[in-house]
UniProtKB/Swiss-Prot annotation:
Organism of origin: Rattus norvegicus (Rat)
Calmodulin-binding, as annotated region: 149-166
GO terms for cellular component: bicellular tight junction; cytoplasm; dendrite; dendritic spine; FAR/SIN/STRIPAK complex; glutamatergic synapse; neuronal cell body; postsynapse
Underlying gene: Strn
Name the record gives this protein: Striatin
Family listed: Belongs to the WD repeat striatin family.
Length: 780
């Protein structure tokens, strides 16, 4: 009974659910004894040993499941840690790779600078100790690869150390001379004369003093004996010698050109005295026999045609080939050296000056000062550049050029490097062959095509067609006049990207409001502090231009509006500003031309065409060649020149006026050439005509567009003409050849009108157009 009750009591004391049966156990046993054996068997079955084992197994299984889940979570975290470590290692490898590339590019840039400096000036560029980039060995490599990389690092250190030794001893130039001599000797193309010259060169380089030669020989012998075993395994001496002579071998220059340039460089750096060959020289040269193997390797790496080039060069070196007095050549060399020393501080002419010179050269039949052909020093086309040609090239560099203000904005930006490195188009000038004149004309016209104007800014703030525009003379600022009764000022440096196009949008920084009708014309003063506008209300409003950096949301400034110039009774069609006299010209639909002072708001000083003999003026401009004259076009097809001082009409330009067709002879715009006495007119019949202001004769007439020509503008240098038309196109013309060099569509049509005005910036690389589609576009 006790043995059977023991497990039950133990179970009831330990099991949490048996607390209620702890005191009922004896009563149950008594009841079981009184009721029968069946009740006692049921009580014993509830606390049996299999039940305990089942409970333990259940708890153990639950513990194992939780442990498995913990291990899974730990494995996931370890995998995440490994992934992050791998990502970090990848970033470090990427950083190392980028650092290596940066070092490589820096080294390549230094080599490129040295190359261009050598080609341009003929001397080496001092950039300090220009060593190839050294990279640290990767830490993650296997142990088998580390000894090899360490040995390579030791090789590099050995090369650098030996290079320093050679520089200290002074063997740099010697190795160059001996190397070139060995190559010619191996190829079998050296003649007696060249051998003697080479021996003299080697004597002058090696035999500075007898003590130096002996000391050099002793140092060379000791180095060779100590490093014989190293030379058997490593051939870094070959690479070191190649680095001295072929630093730019990686570039697109063959060995022949490189050797010629190196030879000339050595000649310029060290004048070679006339010394004879002696025993010390031969002994010193014997120490460089180990370079024969390196020369054979270099010979294999050169192209197959180098042997012929060496032969040609050696033949060129012989004076018998040229029948030239050696004294004359020596004298020319000395003269060239003096000129080069005196011209080191002289800056090469820029692109605009070269263009001025080319424009002047086109009108000259012969150029006696340039009889020999001039080759560009930046792009050598032959294996040898004669000393005479080099001196002539320096004479061309010393020529004076006429001043130019801003012609560089016509040409492309990619010529900036070319203008700094060479003579540009002057490299192809030859006056010996007269048949080259046509090719020169074609090349000069081709240069004008290099600059392609592309749309840059789109000005979208006006609500109606834009009638006129004017650039600030200095700043990148534009003022537009529109039919929506307003003028707007734009700062082209304050841009914002457009939503659906590659061009940039510019918001106006100021809006001028005073006109009671459409604004038809606008002009700025020479200093950019005032602007004047005319409209259909017959008023000429005078404005003070605001600061280009003004906040568009600043409070209203009443001082901007200076006041109206009263006098016209109908629409003002055109304005022109005279910087020389500070006067303003205006033409109006009332048939008069008026001259105003700009220093104050006052009535007109002079009135022209009171009787309307020539018709109603449509356009007016100042004659640039004579500031006291003005030119105006009229509705009847006449163009006349007036003297503003005497108030008299002095000349009426030639015109074929047909009274029956008044619309076809209408002149929409007249402008004056900025440097020549020429007037240019734009006609309703699609023509552009050129007139001589002195004689009034028609110089040239051409059909320029498919529809009426509405606007004209000439660049500040007077080389290019820009025209706008109602056919939606803007065309750029070469004024010398009267040919179109570029055409682009700028605006859309509205009420059969398209482009109202075009303009060049006086000092910056901008052109602008105003259209009937309420847009103004700026091109660069």
């Amino acid at each position: 009974m006790d043995e059977q009750a023991g497990p039950g009591v133990f179970f009831s004391n330990n099991h949490p659910g048996a607390g209620g049966a702890k005191g009922l156990g004896p009563l149950a046993e008594a009841a079981a004894a009184g009721d029968g054996a069946a009740a006692a068997g049921a009580a014993r079955a509830q606390y049996s040993l299999p039940g305990i084992l089942h409970f333990l197994q259940h708890e153990w299984a639950r513990f194992e499941v939780e442990r498995a889940q913990w291990e899974v979570e730990r494995a996931e975290l370890q995998a995440q840690i490994a992934f992050l470590q791998g990502e970090r290692k990848g970033q470090e490898n990427l950083k190392k790779d980028l650092v290596r590339r940066i070092k490589m590019l820096e080294y390549a840039l230094k080599q490129e600078r040295a190359k261009y400096h050598k080609l341009k000036y003929g001397t080496e560029l001092n950039q300090g100790d220009m060593k190839p980039p050294s990279y640290d060995s990767d830490e993650g490599n296997e142990t088998e690869v580390q000894p090899q990389q360490n040995s390579q690092f030791m090789w590099k250190q050995g090369r650098q150390l030996l290079r320093q030794y050679l520089q200290e001893v002074g063997y740099t130039d010697t190795i160059l001379d001996v190397k070139s001599k060995r190559v010619r000797a191996l190829l079998g193309f050296s003649s007696d004369v060249t051998d003697r010259e080479d021996d003299k060169n080697q004597d002058s380089v090696i035999n500075g003093t007898e003590a130096e030669v002996k000391e050099t020989a002793m140092i060379g012998k000791s180095e060779l004996t100590d490093s014989a075993s190293v030379l058997d395994n490593f051939k870094f001496l070959e690479n070191a010698a190649a680095d001295f002579s072929d630093e730019d071998e990686d570039e697109d220059i063959d060995g022949r050109e490189k050797s010629v340039i190196d030879t000339s460089t050595i000649v310029r750096k060290k004048p070679l005295p006339d010394t004879s060959e002696d025993r010390d020289t031969k002994e010193a040269l014997k120490e460089f026999d180990f370079l024969v193997a390196s020369e054979e390797g270099d010979n294999e790496s050169r192209s197959a045609g180098d042997g012929t080039d060496w032969e040609k060069e050696d033949q060129c070196l012989t004076p018998e080939r040229w029948n030239v007095d050696q004294g004359v050549i020596t004298r020319l060399k000395e003269q060239y050296k003096k000129e080069r020393k005196g011209k080191k501080g002289v800056k090469r002419p820029n692109r605009s000056k070269l263009q001025d010179m080319l424009a002047n050269l086109r009108d000259v039949d012969e150029l006696p000062s340039l009889q020999p052909s001039v080759g560009s020093p930046s792009r050598p086309s032959s294996s040898r550049l004669p000393e005479q040609d080099i001196s002539r090239a320096d004479e061309v560099e010393a020529l004076t050029f006429p001043p130019s203000s801003g012609k560089s904005f016509i040409m492309g930006a990619d010529e900036a490097l070319e203008s700094e490195l060479g003579l540009g188009e002057l490299a192809g000038l030859t006056v010996a062959n007269e048949a080259d004149s046509l090719a020169y004309d074609i090349a000069n016209n081709k240069d004008a095509l290099r600059k392609t104007w592309n749309p840059k800014f789109t000005l979208r703030s006006h609500f109606d067609g834009i009638r006129a525009l004017a650039f600030h003379p200095i700043e990148p600022v534009l003022i537009t006049a529109s039919e929506d009764h307003t003028l707007k000022m734009w700062n082209l440096q304050k841009t914002a990207p457009a939503k659906k196009s590659t061009s940039l949008d510019v918001e106006p920084i100021y809006t001028f409001r005073a006109h009671k009708g459409p604004v038809l014309c606008v002009v700025m003063s020479s200093n950019g502090e005032q602007c004047y506008s005319g409209g259909t209300d017959g008023l000429i409003q005078s404005w003070s231009t605001t600061n280009p950096n003004v906040d568009p949301y600043d409070s209203y400034d009443p001082s901007v509006l200076r006041g109206p110039l009263l006098g016209h009774t109908d629409a003002v069609w055109g304005l022109a500003y005279s910087a020389a006299h500070q006067r303003l010209l205006s033409c109006s639909a009332d048939g008069t031309l008026r001259l105003w002072t700009t220093t104050e708001v006052a009535p007109a000083l002079t009135v022209f065409n009171d009787n309307q003999e020539l018709g109603i003026p449509a356009s007016v401009d100042l004659v640039s060649s004579d500031p006291s004259h003005m030119v105006a076009s009229f509705s009847k097809g006449y163009t006349s020149i007036f003297n503003m001082e005497t108030q008299q009409r002095i000349l009426t330009l030639e015109s074929n006026v047909d009274s029956t067709a008044s619309s076809s002879c209408q002149i929409n715009r007249v402008i004056s050439h900025p440097t020549l006495p020429i007037s240019i007119t734009a006609h309703e019949d699609r023509h552009i005509k050129f007139y001589d202001n002195n004689t009034g004769k028609l110089i040239h007439s051409m059909v320029a567009h498919l529809e009426a020509v509405t606007s004209l503008a000439v660049d500040p240098n007077g080389l290019y003409l820009m025209s706008g038309s109602h056919d939606c196109s803007i065309r750029l013309w070469n004024l010398e050849s009267k040919t179109c060099i570029q055409e682009f569509t700028a605006h859309r049509k509205k009420f059969e009108e398209s482009i109202h005005d075009v303009a060049f910036h006086p000092s910056k690389c901008y052109i602008a157009s105003a259209g009937a589609d309420a847009l103004a576009k700026v091109f660069v």
